[in-house]
Amino acid sequence: MQRGKVKWFNNEKGYGFIEVEGGSDVFVHFTAIQGEGFKTLEEGQEVSFEIVQGNRGPQAANVVKL
């Protein structure tokens, strides 16, 4: 599992990016966020996640808020 901080997340569009220290930013879609109810992330929030290869490159999967 990787760890990072949410760079930004757009609730209306349902996606954003996670900053990884020493690495490239990783795309995150709301469907990758674990948990119940409305799935969103806050700027600066710490998360753990896996990186998978999506249609447009690397993206976050199994995102857990820390």
UniProtKB/Swiss-Prot annotation:
- SUPFAM superfamilies documented for this protein: Nucleic acid-binding proteins
Superkingdom, natural source: Bacteria
* InterPro entries xref list: Cold_shock_CspA, Cold_shock_domain, CSD, CSD_CS, CSP_DNA-bd, NA-bd_OB-fold
Record domain CSD: where: 4-63
| Keyword set, alphabetical order | Activator, Cytoplasm, DNA-binding, Stress response, Transcription, Transcription regulation
- Compartment(s) of residence: Cytoplasm
Q: Which GO terms describe its cellular component?
A: cytoplasm
Q: Name one Pfam family in it.
A: CSD
Q: A GO molecular function for this record?
A: DNA binding
Recount the UniProt induction comment for this entry: In response to low temperature.
Where does the chain cross the membrane?
none
* Description of how the protein assembles with itself and partners: Homodimer.
Q: What does this protein do?
A: Affects cell viability at low temperatures.
Name of the featured protein: Cold shock protein CspB
UniProt organism field? Bacillus caldolyticus
